[in-house]
Amino acid sequence: MDMGLFDFSIGANIILSAIVGCQLATTFELGYFGLVVGSIATGALVGLCNGFFYVKLRIPSMIVTAGLALIYESIANYMAGGVEQTLPSSLRALGQMPGNIILAVITFIIAYGILNYTKFGTYTYAIGSDEFVAKNMGINVDKFKVLAFILSGAFFGAMAVLTISYGSSMVAVTG
């Protein structure tokens, strides 16, 4: 992250997000809506948990996210029932050309726009450059750190969509 934080729960976030998205798309028959929205929302929720525990407990982000990764993998394994989650072929368009390129370009444009044209992006770079100065300038550093974890989690959710669509299946112990 641009703030100097480390997130070691990326793999677990992708696994959990992919399994939730796959279950929403297949079990609840929500199709692409369930796959995309479910995966991105789950990724953002995982990011919220990471950010909350990091900010409130004041434990280094490496330790918090490494520990939470084990919890996320356990939740994913429990949700999947220990079996492989398979995405039907009718929902795999985002894992093949040109769907995967379109999704990747959309996420790149969103990330670029957020980091270069919003107050959040400016504050992110300010906190990454010097957290002490940013705090003295009146930036609520803790709030923006949590938001950074949420945003990165949402992008990991988008990666989960690509992963499950390309591979067509996910096992909770893949990562």
For the regions a protein language model found, what residue spans apply to each?
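Alpha-helical transmembrane segments within multi-pass membrane transporters and channels
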Residues: 29-69
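Membrane-interface helix caps of multi-pass small-molecule transporters
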Residues: 23, 28, 48-56, 79, ...
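Hydrophobic alpha-helical transmembrane segments
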Residues: 12-16, 32-41, 63, 101-106, ...
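Transmembrane helix-bundle core of multi-pass membrane transporters
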Residues: 57-120, 144-147, 166-175
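Start (N-cap) of specific transmembrane helices in multi-pass transporter permeases
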Residues: 141-156
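Single transmembrane alpha-helix segments in multi-pass membrane proteins
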Residues: 1-28, 54
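Non-cytoplasmic
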Residues: 6, 157-174
